[in-house]
Amino acid sequence: MSPRDDYLREVGRILRMSEDEFTQVYLLSLGQRPPHPLDPTDGVLMPAAAAWQRAVSGQREISYVNNVQWDLVAYNQPFADIFDGGIPPENTMRWMALADEARDHILTDWETRWAPGILNQIRLAHIQHPENRSLARLNADVKRDKYAGPIYERSTEVYIHPDGDVRPLYHPRKGPGQITMVVSEPASSPGARHVVLLFDLLDEKPTSA
């Protein structure tokens, strides 16, 4: 008989396991990764943040890194150029879901092309990290919002991640276009994301993979 999730978590806390140690014990015991981290703050603090900043600064394409609760950790100048005054938001998902600048100007066709996917990401992140207060606040704020709330409640879209998605975007300096999203996860920060946006103007042929 395999041990239960709550038993393994109690053992992990008593022994003060690191997240990597807990994941290994969980895999050996149950044959799968834990559905959410042992420490609710895991993925919030990124130990390699400085290295990621150097990495994204050297990229030509729009690039940024956010943590498990979508706080912006690192970004390059092409990413900053998307925003008013060249100042990106502190939390990328809160901006995409709730900011007028995003919904009315930058994220073209927000209600149909952007909202269903990003709101489901918020829902799933809150379920996966139930003790994360920032995600709980974001989830609650989205449900209360007069535009995002109804979409959140009626959405039935199965959507886990945006990797490979192509979406319309209005670039303040370049004009209307579309982005292809390339997403990966920093190994030392489960749930964090490294995002690259490949931007193509509407009158240009999209970059081949």
Across the structure, where does each feature detected by a protein language model lie?
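N-terminal start-of-chain detector that recognizes signal peptides
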Residues: 34-38, 43-45, 139-141, 155, ...
